[in-house]
Swiss-Prot record:
The keyword Cytoplasm applies. GO terms for biological process: proteasome-mediated ubiquitin-dependent protein catabolic process. The 26S proteasome consists of a 20S proteasome core and two 19S regulatory subunits. The 20S proteasome core is composed of 28 subunits that are arranged in four stacked rings, resulting in a barrel-shaped structure. The two end rings are each formed by seven alpha subunits, and the two central rings are each formed by seven beta subunits. The catalytic chamber with the active sites is on the inside of the barrel. The proteasome is a multicatalytic proteinase complex which is characterized by its ability to cleave peptides with Arg, Phe, Tyr, Leu, and Glu adjacent to the leaving group at neutral or slightly basic pH. The proteasome has an ATP-dependent proteolytic activity. The gene is pas-2. It is found in: Cytoplasm; Nucleus. It comes from Caenorhabditis elegans. GO terms for molecular function: identical protein binding. It comes from the Eukaryota. Belongs to the peptidase T1A family. Keywords: Cytoplasm, Nucleus, Proteasome. InterPro entries: Ntn_hydrolases_N (IPR029055), Proteasome_alpha (IPR050115), Proteasome_alpha-type (IPR023332), Proteasome_asu_N (IPR000426), Proteasome_sua/b (IPR001353). This is Proteasome subunit alpha type-2.
Amino acid sequence: MGDHYGFSLTTFSPSGKLMQIEYALNAVKNGQPSVGLRAKDGVVLATENVGSVLTDDQPKVEQISKHIGCVYSGMGPDFRILVKKARKIAMEYEMMYGEEMPTIQLVTDIAAVMQEYTQSGGVRPFGASLLIAGWDKNPGRPLLFQCDPSGAYFAWKATALGKNDVNAKTFLEKRFSEALELDDGIHTALLTLRESFDVGMNENNVEVAVCNSTGFHRLTKQQVHDHLGTL
């Protein structure tokens, strides 16, 4: 009977859980760590991306629209599907209304897609959680959200996903300040990421991006190298 609850997507267990969602969240917890931090003048996303020397780079940080981008922990193929859907949603909104989609509206639409995959036949939940960074022009503020496989979403000042996320969040609670500016935010995000790293951090296994009033930008390897040199 226990197997029935574990394999069924739409049947609650006696304890009130949908086990396939629990398993999807485990995929996130076993994923490479990611950190998001909201500074006064922008948002920082940082993540571990350890690949093979034999393969081309597979970025974990992706741009969705001019002022919105995201990073993930969990399963890469699932993330790429979500990014494709998010870009389509953002593009359709911009074509219809002639302006960039507000961050919160994109977050709610993507969360609705993820939730739909928890109660539909023939599919499974997405095995990835997203950290979505955005800058809304009106009233001109940075935003950071998390979307989970269940379809739940949260607004954060700072948070972490993936391996050792509890230690990373504890570190953020000690170091985060509302007064942080973007450069200090990058420094704090990298220090937090180091809490979860199994190997030495360098520009080849770390990705960093920022989102501010000028848009969403991925830092170059040289810029990442320079920031790591200040830790």
